[in-house]
């Protein structure tokens, strides 16, 4: 398990992917 980015945490090419059920909206993860 490699971890994941939660709501309002950074996401993108050099960050963790968003947790399940979240989407990357620009630079932060948000609920879908």
Swiss-Prot record:
Alphabetically, the GO molecular function entries are: toxin activity
Instruction: Give the UniProt tissue specificity note.
Output: Expressed by the venom gland.
Signal peptide segment: none
- Name the principal localization, coarsely classed: secreted
**Where is this protein localized, as stated in its record?**
Secreted
The cellular component terms of Gene Ontology attached to this UniProt record, alphabetical and capped at eight, are: extracellular region
Disulfide bond positions: 4-19, 11-24, 18-29
**Positions in coiled-coil regions:** none
Q: Which domain of life is it from?
A: Eukaryota
Q: What are the protein's UniProt keywords?
A: Disulfide bond, Knottin, Neurotoxin, Secreted, Toxin
Q: What is known of its domains?
A: The presence of a 'disulfide through disulfide knot' structurally defines this protein as a knottin.
What job does this protein perform? Is both paralytic and lethal, when injected into lepidopteran larvae. Is a slower acting toxin, being lethal at 24 hours, but not paralytic at 1 hour post-injection.
Q: What family is it from? A: Belongs to the neurotoxin 14 (magi-1) family.
What is the protein name stated in its UniProt record?
U3-cyrtautoxin-As1a
